[in-house]
């Protein structure tokens, strides 16, 4: 049975939650062994897949979880706004570390390596390709190039202002066009994740609301301070 077929079964049984275990950089939680522990806890709680950034984190996580891992490498480039898995070497390193799915930036922005080249390299390793997109045009272009999974990950992050709510309209548009959509980006409550599924998402990735303790504390602190002002 193919990995996609296995995921279809798991999503039908468990609801389609993917947990992104990416601690705040330099946080006390930003250690491979802690990332792996969070991933294992998420798997035991019913997550159908895990999203991991960085080769060391992926290696540590691969050793303890059996669910599929979506691997990425983030870089801050001087000559490109693209941050997610920008190089062939990143794809190779993630494949070697045990990723099942490799996600790349799928936006139409200047980049060191074309999207189609990165997709071909992912498929060379026999892995599934996911593209993190920001618009319907991005997603449909990546689907035509052969990406098996389209993420709404970058919606709201390629524009001057980032909205507070997730982009459900993008989920629906891509789903209606026949894409296998992972809704991602600002899904900070179970209700929002459920809305994404109702709008046609194949699965939903949740990160900050589950694995970024600093963000969660900030949300509570902000709300509570407002209540007493």
Curated annotation (Swiss-Prot):
Keywords: Carbohydrate metabolism, Isomerase
Domain of life (superkingdom): Bacteria
Isomerase is among the record's keywords: yes
Enzyme Commission number(s) of this protein: 5.1.3.9
Stored Pfam families: NanE
Function per UniProt: Converts N-acetylmannosamine-6-phosphate (ManNAc-6-P) to N-acetylglucosamine-6-phosphate (GlcNAc-6-P).
Similarity comment: family membership: Belongs to the NanE family.
UniProt-recorded name of the protein: Putative N-acetylmannosamine-6-phosphate 2-epimerase
Organism: Escherichia fergusonii (strain ATCC 35469 / DSM 13698 / CCUG 18766 / IAM 14443 / JCM 21226 / LMG 7866 / NBRC 102419 / NCTC 12128 / CDC 0568-73)
Organismal lineage: Bacteria, Pseudomonadati, Pseudomonadota, Gammaproteobacteria, Enterobacterales
